[in-house]
């Protein structure tokens, strides 16, 4: 969270944490938010492979992958997060989702759909 942003009610900023327990509680809260957002993203990936099946499109679209990485790096820089960290995380996530899409597409094609 940017230093000038106000914390939502009940949420401590890093500077407001007075103990390691409070820091860990906030990290756990942030982790829940991250997983919830990954679940939301996965819903879109789920829809993407269905559309790709209809359009006979590939799961792996390198230009799109790079476009996503470039956007994430820019957002990271704006937020003061190391762009290399976010790129590494997103490349891992994109790779996992590509494999997921490929398995789904292969399963549907083999099933004759």
Predicted regions and their residues:
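Domain-level signature for soluble enzymes in the chorismate/prephenate branch of the shikimate pathway
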Residues: 1-113
